[in-house]
From Swiss-Prot:
Its cofactor is Mg(2+). Its EC number is 3.6.1.23. One of its GO terms (biological process) is dUMP biosynthetic process. Keywords: Hydrolase, Magnesium, Metal-binding, Nucleotide metabolism. InterPro entries: dUTPase, dUTPase-like, dUTPase-like_sf, dUTPase_trimeric. This enzyme is involved in nucleotide metabolism: it produces dUMP, the immediate precursor of thymidine nucleotides and it decreases the intracellular concentration of dUTP so that uracil cannot be incorporated into DNA. Pathway: Pyrimidine metabolism; dUMP biosynthesis; dUMP from dCTP (dUTP route): step 2/2. This is Deoxyuridine 5'-triphosphate nucleotidohydrolase. Belongs to the dUTPase family.
Length: 152
């Protein structure tokens, strides 16, 4: 199933130098977001920066949200991850998408203009109403917390 997504191009390099965000394969869950930088940016170990994506989106459907996630290769190979873990974009937000980028690695890393540095995933939302209770019906796990189910 494909739905439309309103996108505003905030950087004129889209269309000429850079393609619009798109799914890389038929089964891709996310679309890559680019670093809409004017010049290369070097992140020293421990540094964080807000990097513009060059686009704004408007989901306009309260039953979906967007999340910005790291690209696995950048995180695994270079320690480049999102400074906020995951970026959550509400359906009524219309501003520019900024990517909180953090170098948790041991070496400086340079991001070039147009580099694909994160991915955008659209997800369904289930809204709930809270029901205050005194006790829960027993479950197999109960209140077992971190490590409760073991490693093996």
């Amino acid at each position: 199933m494909t739905q439309s997504l309103q996108v505003k191009l905030l950087d004129p390099r889209f269309g000429d130098l850079w393609p619009l965000p798109a799914y890389a394969t038929e089964a891709s869950a996310g679309m890559d977001l680019r670093a809409a930088l004017e010049a290369p940016m070097t992140l020293e170990p421990g540094d964080a920066a807000l990097i513009p994506s060059g686009i704004a989106i408007h989901l306009d459907d309260p039953q979906v949200c967007a999340v910005i996630l790291p690209r696995s290769g950048l995180g695994h190979r270079h320690g480049i991850v999102l400074g906020n873990g995951t970026g959550l974009i509400d359906a009524d937000y219309q501003g520019p998408l900024l990517i909180s980028t953090w170098n948790r690695g041991r070496e400086a890393f340079t991001i070039e203009p147009g580099d694909r540095i994160a991915q955008l995933v659209i997800l369904p939302i289930v809204r709930v109403s809270l029901q205050v209770v005194d006790t829960f019906v027993d479950s197999a796990r109960g209140a077992g917390g971190f490590g409760h189910t073991g490693v093996r």
